[in-house]
């Protein structure tokens, strides 16, 4: 979040009080994000020493620190076990519901997509197969043909 600070290494000493207050505000915001994503207990550990699912949540936290209006998530649960997948799905829903941040999710685990998405776009080699609500997509015969080889 340092890019959000209005004082830098040169101007900081000239505006010491203001720079210090800004730093405190940014630190509090980062702590809020860590609490929101259940990361507060991991603050003193090197990221590389943490479990994979926690590392992915830290990545989401870094993105949230930028105060986005749209959060782009490219396969956020790839390589995760079931518990990590469920935790991540919970946090994605929290981000949407509690923070009001729109999310664009690219994911191949269709059960997760159906649980998280309001709208789904199905692509086949870059071509749009279907767009609609999860229930519509599940009933779409073309989607079944593309993804299940014609079985429905």
List the model feature ranges, each with a label.
Residues 1-152:
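Glycine-rich phosphate-binding loops of nucleotide-dependent enzymes
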